[in-house]
Structure formats: structure tokens, C-alpha cells
Amino acid sequence: MARTRASKSLVDRVYEYLLDQIITGAIRYGDTISIKGMAGRLSVSSMPVREALKRLEFEGVVDIKPRSSCTVRVPSRRTILEVYALREALEVYALSCCGGRFPRASLARMEGIVARMRALGKEQDPVEKEKKAIALDREFHGEICALAGNDLLNATYRQLTLRVNMTLMHEKTFHTMEEDWAKMHADVLSCLQKDPVRAVGLLRSHFAGATEIWKKNGGTARA
């Protein structure tokens, strides 16, 4: 039994690693994952990698192919729009759970995130700038979801960002929104601090604007 529990724990760790790699964009949609190569990278046998990938296949994230490899599914246009709509719904729900009173610690963390967003304007390397912007965007919206204090909501949100990560959205939106990007997030935070009722409308507007820019800038045409 001890060996079974240890093996299961190893599968969980490999699964979490793969999740993190996809969510952060280190593994991109359409990439091929070699089971043998991943096992070598993580210094484990092929078995836990294979089992972790089976879980991701069941969740609709990858397609396992013969010859010990799999491909990360490229989300369709419909999936992207559905995920974005659900993300908006979850964040709006999270705000409604607080009744207009938000934890100071949460607001302080969001202030720190916004400060780093503003400082990012000084970054000269465009690749590094976008990489950091994606991470900060993910942090900010994750903090909004965390306001609900609902573990299931947070887990659902994470699954949504697995299906459609911030990297995919930023590829079609960041360069258009770049000048106002930090300000948009700062405005949402300001409303949370001073005008909670208006915060919901501003958050919806933020999602609507990003969605329209994504569509105009050539969001994937797959149905």
C-alpha cells in the first residue's frame, strides 16, 4: 500500500508540473510532449508521466498518440469565448460574495501587482515584458477569484486557465491594450477600494474590451 500511495503521489506531482507548464505558457497549445523526454526531464520513470497525461486527456487538454507522445490541444474559437465568459462570471461572483467589503490583505497584494504592472513600462525587452505581463495578469485575476474564499471556485478557475491560458489571450490583445493595460487594472482596484458597486461594471467592461480586441486581432477561426 505504501508503494501505491507513493506512486500516486508521484503521478500527482507530475500532473501538477504539467498543469503549471501549460497554464504559464511554457508548454504551448499544439506542442508535442514526449513521454520519454518528460520522464527524463523530471528524473522519473515513464509510468507517472503516462498516467498524468491520461488525466489531462480525460480533461480534454491533450491527445495521446502512439509512439509515446501526445499533443496539447489547440482550443477552438468557441472554447476560448466560452472560457472567457466563464472567467468573467466567476470573478463577478467572487466580488458579490464580499458584499462590498474586501480583505485589506487582498487589496494590498493587488496594489503590489498593479505597482509591478506600472513598473513594467520601463522594461526594454519586449519578450520579457510580455512574459511578465502575462504572469501579473494571472496574479491579479487570481486574487479577484480568491476574494470569494471558495476552494472549488479557485479550482474551477485554474481549470479554465488550463484550457485557455493568459498567454493565448495576450498574443492577440496585449500589443493593442499595452498603453492602457496597467491603468485598466488600477481602475478596477480603485473601485474595489472606493466604489465596490461600480467595480462589477468595470470588470465586465474590462472583459468585454479584451474579447473584442481578441476578435479584431485575428482570434483563432476554428469553430
What does each model-found stretch correspond to?
Residues M1-G100, T211, K215-A223:
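Short linear motifs at protein or domain termini
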Residues Q21, A26, L120, Q124, ...:
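Hydrophobic side-chain positions on well-ordered alpha-helices
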Residues T79, P103-S106, D125-A133, G149, ...:
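Residue-level recognition of alpha-helical structural elements
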Residues V83, M110, A133, D137, ...:
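Hydrophobic packing residues in well-ordered alpha-helices of helical domains and bundles
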Residues L86-F102, R138-H175, I213-W214:
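Hydrophobic, amphipathic alpha-helical faces that serve as interaction scaffolds
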Residues L90, I113-R116, L120, K129-K132, ...:
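Amphipathic coiled-coil alpha-helices
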Residues R118, M169-A223:
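C-terminal all-alpha effector/ligand-binding and dimerization domain
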